[in-house]
Amino acid sequence: MRIDILTLFPDTMRAMLGESILGRAQARGLLDIRCHQIRDYTENRQKQVDDYPYGGGWGQVMMAQPLKSCLDAALADSTVPVERRRVIYLSPQGPTFTQAKARQLKADYDQLVLVCGHYEGVDERFIEACVDEELSIGDFVLTGGELGAMVVTDCVCRMVPGVLSDTECYTGESHWAGRLEYPQYTRPETWEGRTVPEVLRGGNHAEIEAWRTRQSLERTLKRPDLFQETPPTPDEQRLLDKIRRDRSRPQLTEPPICRAATEDDLPAILAIAQQARNYLRRHRVDQWQGVYP
């Protein structure tokens, strides 16, 4: 998988994307991540990449020429077929990036070109001429597209075979199948009075799997929109019904207390005995349940 990032801050991007899992994957040749300085492709001595917007208004707009020249340079040595390349502009106006979208990008393309805007955005003519699609990482506005580009890069690249040790490293995580992941614990067994659930320490894999399934569904109940996107299976629905029933039952704030009787309890015990005697005589029955005051 090749990722080309067009940005005004390539050194920052390289530093972040060259660490940890993605850094090791690049060293092993599994990923090819390249960061291109847009400012290197300007046609003026000042290295200016932006100008005032037509029609007035606040801020500056990135010019189409340096963006197009930078894009051309990024694609010049690409051996990836055109149909397997995708140019994406990170923008708050695009559809929201999701795990499903990441899977689609990973499956359909071998090269992604991520364009990072800045200031008030980029000249619309560049988007019309060169961009295949816009993507947003949420309904908020950032200073530039760099954070969005890092999010897309990390999410897509971790699904490249060999980047993670096993496919289960990401197929069992939140959002992969429209569900949120169950809680995770590690050593020590007890920390600040909080203990790892007993089921996870028992070694019964069937019970552990059942616990994790229930915990995953309980967490996903916090995001009902996920059930709309991926409706529950019949088995999940039965478990969800049980979870809701369990939640609707009143919970005892304190457990019942039992203790041995003392001399102080003798008057109450005698009173119960008298109640029993009177009840048996009056109703002519041989069983009675007294109420301890």
What are these regions (language model features)?
Residues 1, 188-255:
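SAM-dependent methyltransferases
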Residues 147, 159-199:
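Internal, active-site/partner-interface "lid" segment
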Residues 1-4, 85, 256-257:
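Extreme N-terminal starter segment of soluble prokaryotic enzymes
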Residues 270, 274-293:
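Conserved GNAT-fold acetyl-CoA-binding loop/helix
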Residues 63-118, 161:
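S-adenosyl-L-methionine/SAH cofactor-binding core of RNA-modifying enzymes
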Residues 257-271:
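A short beta-loop-alpha structural element at the N-terminal edge
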Residues 122, 126-173:
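Structured adenosyl-cofactor binding patch, chiefly the S-adenosyl-L-methionine
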Residues 1-77, 207-221, 225-228:
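N-terminal nucleotide/polyanion-binding subdomain common to many enzyme families
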